[in-house]
Swiss-Prot record:
Subunit comment: The cytochrome bc1 complex contains 11 subunits: 3 respiratory subunits (MT-CYB, CYC1 and UQCRFS1), 2 core proteins (UQCRC1 and UQCRC2) and 6 low-molecular weight proteins (UQCRH/QCR6, UQCRB/QCR7, UQCRQ/QCR8, UQCR10/QCR9, UQCR11/QCR10 and a cleavage product of UQCRFS1). This cytochrome bc1 complex then forms a dimer.
Binding of a ubiquinone, residues: 201
Membrane-topology descriptor: Multi-pass membrane protein
Gene this chain is encoded by: MT-CYB
InterPro entries per record: Cyt_b/b6_C (IPR005798), Cyt_b/b6_C_sf (IPR036150), Cyt_b/b6_N (IPR005797), Cytb/b6-like_sf (IPR027387), Cytochrome_b (IPR030689), Cytochrome_b_C_euk/bac (IPR048260), Cytochrome_b_N_euk/bac (IPR048259), Di-haem_cyt_TM (IPR016174)
Gene Ontology molecular function, alphabetical: metal ion binding; ubiquinol-cytochrome-c reductase activity
Record's GO cellular component terms: mitochondrial inner membrane; respiratory chain complex III
Cofactor note: Binds 2 heme b groups non-covalently.
Biological source species: Kogia sima
Organism classification: Eukaryota, Metazoa, Chordata, Craniata, Vertebrata
Protein's name in the database: Cytochrome b
Length: 379
């Protein structure tokens, strides 16, 4: 008798994706982040659902409803901080996942990669609208500053901004629609993640060597399920430690002050995971130029498959490319630090240098280095 998991229409799909999936035998822990992102998404949807049961998307009561969740709802503070810090964990896993793809040449699977970039954009949009919901000072001013960037679009900019706001400033209508977006987007992310997996399973996973592994595959279960469970336990431990010992470590104290349109905070800055893009935005003195650079900082990822000039897929045996990759990581960390600093002399210049280096590395230096490495292979 054939096993039900191989014949049942629904079970068959799950079986082919998570049980009998042929997987390369040599994939490292860097391949854990895909499943960790799935775990993060489920955690965020569940905690978010419980928060939505008590939250009111109205300018007069939003802030106090969040306070009510923390003070009066049973374990509401745990749910709220799991959700807030879960977002940080989500982005740590996202950036590690993208970094893994860059290092090992996973971007050669173009459909999977491009859907991944769209997913990154969608998660960033979700995090942004979600940050507005507590209606603190940084929520309000962050929403004002970022939505205002659309006014840089020639001719239709101002109309577009007012259309997004639902009025002439960030107000009741803006908060209500942002709550609606924040509720619907995670389900769109869930659907996109399934398409991401669908395309990945068409080709099979890449591996650290960047070579075909069809002759050496092992079933996903039990080998990688157990490995993923270890990763999941580490992620949950980190999230719980952060939530229970330092829940406000990554947040902004300004968001504990209710939104006040008449008082601008001294330093408007987004959450830590957007600081690198914020630094790139600020490094260009022109408004439209800044917006273009901001978009390109993520969109440039879509160009990477076309900029792959190496004869080898992975960076494992390409020391010069490895060096540039780690320079890129250091550059992004520098941009993250600068994004959180005030707009003053040394930081502005450093930000401009780091932003230039970011685009230079991806668009020029890395493809050129790959060509040089190709030549060195012949020597």
């Amino acid at each position: 008798m054939t096993n039900i998991r191989k014949t049942h229409p629904l079970m068959k799909i799950i079986n082919n994706a998570f049980v009998d999936l042929p997987t390369p035998s040599n994939i490292s822990s860097w391949w854990n982040f895909g499943s960790l992102l799935g775990l993060c998404l489920i955690t965020q949807i569940l905690t978010g659902l419980f928060l939505a049961m008590h939250y009111t998307p109205d300018t007069t009561t939003a802030f106090s409803s969040v306070t009510h969740i923390c003070r009066d709802v049973n374990y509401g503070w745990v749910i709220r901080y799991l959700h807030a810090n879960g977002a940080s964990m989500f982005f740590i896993c996202l950036y590690a996942h993208v970094g893994r793809g860059l290092y090992y040449g996973s971007y050669v699977f173009q459909e999977t990669w491009n859907i991944g970039v769209i997913l990154l954009f969608t998660v960033m949009a979700t995090a942004f609208v979600g940050y507005v919901l507590p209606w603190g000072q940084m929520s309000f001013w962050g929403a004002t500053v970022i939505t205002n960037l659309m006014s840089a679009i020639p001719y239709i900019g101002t109309t577009l901004v007012e259309w997004v706001w639902g009025g002439f400033s960030v107000d009741k209508a803006t908060l209500t629609r942002f709550f609606a977006f924040h509720f619907i987007l995670p389900f769109i992310i869930l659907a996109l993640a399934m398409v991401h997996l669908l395309f990945l399973h068409e080709t099979g996973s890449n591996n650290p060597l960047g070579i075909p592994s069809d002759m050496d595959k092992i079933p996903f279960h039990p080998y990688y399920t157990i490995k993923d469970i270890l990763g999941a336990l580490l992620l949950i431990s980190a999230l719980l430690t952060l939530t229970l010992f330092a829940p406000d470590l990554l947040g902004d104290p300004d968001n504990y002050t209710p939104a006040n349109p008449l008082s601008t905070p001294a330093h408007i800055k987004p959450e830590w995971y957007f600081l690198f893009a914020y630094a790139i935005l600020r490094s260009i003195p022109n408004k439209l130029g800044g917006v273009m650079a901001l978009l390109l900082s993520i969109l440039v990822l879509m160009l990477i498959p076309m900029l792959h000039t190496s004869k080898q897929r992975s960076m494992m045996f390409r020391p010069f490319s490895q060096f540039l990759f780690w320079v890129l990581v250091a550059d992004l960390l520098t941009l993250t630090w600068i994004g959180g600093q005030p707009v003053e002399h040394p930081y502005m210049t450093l930000g401009q240098l780091a932003s230039t280096l970011y685009f230079l590395l991806i668009l020029v230096l890395m493809p050129l280095t790959s060509l040089i490495e190709n030549k060195l292979l012949k020597w």
